[in-house]
Regions:
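Basic, low-complexity intrinsically disordered segments
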Residues: 1-158
Length: 158
């Protein structure tokens, strides 16, 4: 049986299968990430509406965070700070978008939070999100590119 592993056809076949598995895993991660961002958008939308309509303040958000953490102890991301970040995420984009904008929906949540903290215009956030997707930037690289004013260099190249 081990002799087969030395044949070129076999090595090509196993390589093709491994590549297919890796591609499928990458798509699954992206799908999960996109769904999480949709969840965070919806939570942010609800928090925004409740705070405007019911004048709920930070004490209510604090209690929600505690209740969510108790209900989902193995899940991260439901701290008071995270809930406020979800509201900020929604509030930042909702004047122009009804759903999570496409390039942003392909980014990890940490990247999104970095952009919201460091970039003030929707247009620039979308530019950085697209660049992250195209170039596969880590969060550290994204932060560096923002500090180096990547958007100005790209603007000069266009």
């Amino acid at each position: 049986m081990s002799e087969i592993t030395h044949h070129t056809d076999y090595r090509q076949a196993i390589t093709a299968i491994k590549q297919r598995i890796q591609a499928s895993q990458a798509r699954a991660v992206m799908a999960v990430n996109a769904e999480l961002l949709n969840l965070y958008w919806d939570i942010g939308r609800q928090l925004d509406a409740w705070q405007r309509e019911r004048a709920w303040g930070s004490a209510v958000v604090e209690q929600m965070a505690l209740d969510l953490q108790a209900s989902y102890p193995r899940m991260k991301g439901f701290s008071r700070t995270s809930l406020f970040a979800m509201r900020q995420f929604y509030a930042f984009f909702s004047p122009q978008f009804e759903v999570v904008p496409q390039p942003v929906g392909q980014m990890p949540w940490g990247h999104v939070r970095t952009l919201l903290a460091k970039v003030k215009s929707v247009e620039l956030v979308l530019l950085y999100a697209q660049a992250c997707f195209e170039h596969g930037w880590s969060r550290t690289v994204l932060e560096w590119q923002i500090e180096q004013r990547f958007h100005e260099r790209v603007g000069q190249a266009v």
